């Protein structure tokens, strides 16, 4: 009896951080258009496992979003 060929397991490629690299955008609390891409439709900060942002850049991003919220550039809650 012939055996079926072994299948290779599905391997999901790890996304690279959008803020690392030579021409990556700079994280700035005044750039509300960039920051809104990392905030959910309810106004929460999207986790790095979804956005593929590195841990260091995720901390910078969270700090920038919180600063922008405090200054009124971003809303705390989106209804």
Swiss-Prot record:
Organism the protein comes from: Bradyrhizobium sp. (strain ORS 278)
A GO term for molecular function: structural constituent of ribosome
The protein's name in its UniProt record: Small ribosomal subunit protein bS18
Domain of life: Bacteria
Transmembrane segment boundaries: none
Described function: Binds as a heterodimer with protein bS6 to the central domain of the 16S rRNA, where it helps stabilize the platform of the 30S subunit.
SUPFAM superfamilies per UniProt: Ribosomal protein S18
An individual GO BP term: translation
Family: Belongs to the bacterial ribosomal protein bS18 family.
InterPro entries: Ribosomal_bS18, Ribosomal_bS18_CS, Ribosomal_bS18_sf
Keywords: Ribonucleoprotein, Ribosomal protein, RNA-binding, rRNA-binding
Subunit structure: Part of the 30S ribosomal subunit. Forms a tight heterodimer with protein bS6.
Organism ancestry: Bacteria, Pseudomonadati, Pseudomonadota, Alphaproteobacteria, Hyphomicrobiales
GO cellular component, one term: cytosolic small ribosomal subunit
Matching Pfam families: Ribosomal_S18
HAMAP family listed in its UniProt record: Ribosomal_bS18
